[in-house]
Amino acid sequence: KILATSLLIEAFLYEEQTRRGISLKHFDEFNDVADHCTVCHKCLTPCPVDIDFGDVSISMRNFLRKQGKKKFNPGSYAAMLFLNATDPTTIKIIRKTMIEWGYAGQRLGYQLAKRFGLIGSQTRNPPATVGKPPLKAQVIHMINKPMPGHLPKKTSRALLGLEDPAIVPVIRNPARLNEDSEAVFYFPGCGSERLFGQVGLATQAMLFHLGAQTVLPPGYLCCGYPQTSAGNDDKGQAITTANRVLFHRVANTLNYLDIKTVIVSCGTCMDQLLKYQFDKIFPGCRLLDIHEYLMEKGLKLDGVTGTRYMYHDPCHTPIKTYNPLKVANDLLGGGVKLSDRCCGESGTLAVTRPDISTQVRSRKQEEIIKVAAEINQETASTENPKIKLLTSCPSCLQGLSRYNDDTGIEADYIVVEMAKHLLGSTWMEDYIASANNGGIERVLL
């Protein structure tokens, strides 16, 4: 990709210097190279010339947008519409149409394509992804792995009645509140709040269980990372600046709470929030993933029988203070195996370039099957365990859920799995009832 980009730049320079006029076909190739990147930055480590192609890809996308040559993509447009929305009614409408009905339609398409044998050859031996595939192939790429079902009907904020952007919610457990109760600021992000609301609720429920005072941001907020990585740097910067100003206002309003920890439950949010200079908003604070926080507090699952766990460490891992696999093992009682490789979802990649996603998923599926076979081999003599694939990223949760049909392995979030075992199978209903029964203080911003 580095060579391809260098050659394209050279072609631009050559045509400009020889006054032949610049061929617009170069922009198509530029788009294609820029699309082949999940912005995970993992290619920097082995790169012999220290080029971070994630940053280069973002620059290429910004260049194409500014030149008016970035190709319109309906999938990307729809995803950004959902992420940029802050009005509760707009979010509700988009969730109903795009997520609920759209996902159901995609799953129906998958079932039909599977029945007529249209998927097998494409997923077994994914075709090359240079240039745009034909329309029929694109459609099959889009439906060759089913979207997850059984999503919460409402967002986590809607379930708690906290959609007013003029209110700062402070959630605390009155039964466990004392002078030493720690105050934390929890930034749920889009994935844990709008899409997989159970993740945001499980995070809050565990903090509630620990007796922490949890401060939530007012209203629906996106961190700005998806916009920046998609090549819309202006929008990403605008969101980041607006959020930082808002958080300063929150800090001033709640200056009587000594907030020393900012909690996230999403890796891309963590990457973006590291740029927010939180030490100037809440002096002396640190950024932690919810799983790191729970590990520090000594929470763990003991004696879970009949289930073995695999852990998928996201490309944008939110666990940056400790070793991710160690955190997973500590929380889940040991015996957790790492499932390597990218899941292929990568935020909006799966809807913008499903052909590239198909290639990535092919390799990931091999890895899941291999690790599952290792677990079955280890436990063959004693038990036949149920295997679960856990992660710590909402986008990865969606991506990993799509392998369920082919591998029979269920995907979930570590914090959700912990909530089920530590707080009971009705943890969500119990938490919502407790929070709504005197557990929420609504502070006017």
For each feature predicted by the language model, list its residue ranges.
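Secondary-structure capping and boundary motifs in well-ordered enzyme cores
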Residues: I22-C40, D180-A183, L195-V199, V215
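Cysteine-centered iron-sulfur cluster-binding motifs in ferredoxin-type domains/subunits
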Residues: K1, E29-I51, R194, P314, ...
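General secondary-structure edge motif
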Residues: Q17, H26-F27, C40, F187, ...
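Ferredoxin-type iron-sulfur electron-transfer modules and their immediate structural context
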Residues: K1-H36, P48, D55, N62-K69, ...
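Iron-sulfur cluster-binding electron-transfer modules in prokaryotic oxidoreductases
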Residues: D55-L445
